[in-house]
Each structure stands twice: as structure tokens, then as C-alpha cells.
Amino acid sequence: MKPVKVGICGLGTVGGGTFNVLERNAEEIARRAGRGIEVAQIAARRPNPKCDTGATPITADIFDVACNPEIDVVVELIGGYTLAHELVLKAIENGKHVVTANKALIAVHGNEIFAKAREKGVIVAFEAAVAGGIPVIKAIREGLSANRINWLAGIINGTGNFILSEMREKGRTFPDVLAEAQALGYAEADPTFDVEGIDAAHKLTILASIAFGIPLQFDKAYTEGISKLTSADVNYADALGYRIKHLGVARRTESGFELRVHPTLIPSDRLIANVNGVMNAVMVNGDAVGSTLYYGAGAGMEPTASSVVADLVDVVRAMTSDPENRVPHLAFQPDALSDHPILPIEACESAYYLRIQAKDHPGVLAQVATILSERGINIESIMQKEAEEQDGLVPMILVTHRVIEQRINDAIAALEALEGVSGPVVRIRVEQLN
């Protein structure tokens, strides 16, 4: 059979890795796909010194690839929202299958893109958009298809995980570790997407849609970053038997779905609590299988290329099949997607870590306990430290049982109004993941 002809748009880290893997493992890939996969054209603004593209035609215009009649599959690896969106729609319009690693594109424009792809009978594959080299999308969409997924939780941004790991292991401050992450290339010059949870929210949006069979709704995901975390809270969490991770959590409830990204205390004996550095991990809990864990490199040249090429193999296998018999993009048929709402954060339920800076006066603890009790908030554990020499304040650390967030909001407002409490109350959510 003739090889399938692929056009790669973007020859940066992932694009270069994809080209190299396709070239190096060409024979093995052909054996798996049933026919060869040939890179027939590349769109790139500049060469990649880590790639020997040889005689492969190169253009500076990505739309040359989308409009090339010889190309069967367009691989979109340019990133961003605008140009990538236009490129993918043009490729679909021209009847080409698409493989992308662009989580922002899928999270924000995926509903539109998948609808256009169905109209044209083409495939859009996006395994590499979440957690790099970990095939977690395929695991949820296909491997766990017998299950009603109850919840999933993931460390899905390597930059944030590197920062929190360094803060815990070496006692370093957030600004100090962020500067190193930027120097090492883990974080961008503008690290907002990584440290404020936007990148993780893109990925969580995709995972939740596949797990629960709901439309992509990135705009309804609650997002909270790690830039305000202090070494003190990392250390207190450690003393209580927890690790702080920047976690994406999606949960099915009777009222709707929770979709939230935020710093989270996890018991230190959980496997996911011990995922350190730039590595990623995703836990998925299904009613039949129980809890499963998927771990690996969440980024990088060839780990991400591994998922891109795996998608290419799947596309080659499925491109001649009847579109009605293909695995749906979001695991469920479009007319079977749930319309249950995404819950606002105030309606979500969690346990909470609260750090209160109390004045060294008698009766403050009793006042705190009364405020929590009046709002139906039960305390699981409490830790009081010695008064700090600098300002005479006593750090009071509480861990509550699970409760609706609105009650915690009300309690924090009342606590901060107490004369015996100084400054804002620190609140970090707690998940047992069992």
C-alpha cells in the first residue's frame, strides 16, 4: 500500500521530536499502522538543529500544508489559539485528518472543531494535548469504557510540580525556584499559564469531557495558582502528613460536575503525592476498576512526540473505516453528551487546611472553634506552633472534614473579623484520593 503522507506544521521541540521519531522508527511504525507514514512536507519559520530533514520540502506558510492535495494528515504543532485554530479548520475543510498536541486549542475550540470534523468525516486526534507522553486520554476513552468514572485528579503541569517539589525538599521560596525553572527552560519568560493553573485547566477540561461525556467547558473551570504559597505552609503540611500538589480535580456529584485546579494537600502515603520534579501523573477512579494511576513525562521533545506518533498510527488504521464506527472524539456520541452543569466553586465540596495567625491571647482557639461549629464545619486535626518571635503571633493550623466551600468562605470572613486574628486566613483544599 502507498504510504500515508503527513504534513508537520511547526518544527520546534515537539515538531522536531515527531519528525525524528517517525524517521528513526519508520519500520516499526509501518508494521503497527499497516502501511508507511511519510513526512511529505514541513511548515517551519526556521530549521531545527536537532532534525536532519534532508530533502523533505519545507515551507514558511502553514496553510501550504493544509492546502496541499498530496497531504493526508496535518500535524498541528505550532501552539496558540488563533493561527492554530485557522489552520485546523482549513485542514478539515480540505478533507484532511488532523493530529494536534495543542491543549489550549482543544479546550477552547474543541466543540467547534469536532463538529466540523464530523461534517467532513475526518479524524481529529489529540492524545499529546494532555500529559505529554502519558497515554491517559486513550486509557479513559477506550481502556476504561466499561466504567462510570467517579472522579479524576492529576498533576498535569510539570513546571508547577517542579516548583513545589523544590520548595518542599530544599526549603526554597517560590520566586527563587521559579527563576531556576525559567533558567532551565521549564517555565516561560511569562510563567502565568503554568503557575496560575491555566495550562492545567486546559488539560483538565479535556480529561473531564472524556471521562464524563460532557461538552468542553474551559470557561467554567475554577483556576487557582501556586504563586501565593509559602514555604511555611509547605512545611506545616509536611508535619501534618501531607504534600502540597498543584492538582486538577474533576468529580461527578448528584448536582453536577466539579472542575477545579488549585493547590491541594494530599496524604503523603498516596503514590501521586510522591510524584516529583517535572513528572506528571493522573489518577482515575471508575466504579468497576477502582482507582488507577498513570505516570510519566508530561512534556519534552520525544515523550510528547511519542503520543503524536501514536495518534498518527491510530489515524492511519481508522482513516479507511466508516466514520460512524470510529471512536468518538470525546468518548461519547455527540447526542449522548450530558447537560449536567459544571458547579461553581462555592458549591464544590472538599476538606480544608486553614492557617490562622492568632494573637497570643487566651480564648482565641475557643472563638475559632465556635465560628466553625456554628457553620457545621468539623475539625479533623489541629496544630498550634509557638508564638513567632518577630510579631508574637501564634500560627494555628486546622484541617477540617469535607464541607461545601460556601461554608468555609463564610467562616473565613468571620475569622478574619476577630480581634484575636491577624491578617488573612490561608485556605488550601485537601483531597484524600481514596
Curated annotation (Swiss-Prot):
Sequence positions that bind NADPH: 13-14, 45, 103, 300
Positions with a binding annotation for Na(+): 127, 130, 132, 134
GO molecular function: homoserine dehydrogenase activity; metal ion binding; NAD+ binding; NADP binding
Residue numbers binding NAD(+): 14, 33, 43, 300
The entry's keywords: Amino-acid biosynthesis, Metal-binding, Methionine biosynthesis, NAD, NADP, Oxidoreductase, Sodium, Threonine biosynthesis
EC number of this enzyme: 1.1.1.3
Ranges annotated as spanning the membrane: none
Broad enzyme group: oxidoreductase
CDD domains: ACT_HSDH-Hom (cd04881)
UniProt: NADP(+) binding residues: 14, 45-46, 103, 185, 188, 300
GO biological process, one term: threonine biosynthetic process
Residues binding L-homoserine: 188, 199
Alphabetical list of PROSITE patterns matching this protein: ACT (PS51671), HOMOSER_DHGENASE (PS01042)
Cofactor: a metal cation
Entry annotation: catalytic residues: 203 (proton donor)
Domain ACT: 353-429
SUPFAM superfamilies registered for this protein in UniProt: ACT-like, Glyceraldehyde-3-phosphate dehydrogenase-like, C-terminal domain, NAD(P)-binding Rossmann-fold domains
Pfam short name (any one): NAD_binding_3
Catalytic activity field: L-homoserine + NADP(+) = L-aspartate 4-semialdehyde + NADPH + H(+); L-homoserine + NAD(+) = L-aspartate 4-semialdehyde + NADH + H(+)
Cofactor note: A sodium ion is seen in the structure; a metal ion may subtly affect the relative position of the nucleotide-binding region to influence enzyme activity, and could increase the stability of the enzyme.
Function of the protein: Catalyzes the conversion of L-aspartate-beta-semialdehyde (L-Asa) to L-homoserine (L-Hse), the third step in the biosynthesis of threonine and methionine from aspartate.
Name used for this protein in its record: Homoserine dehydrogenase
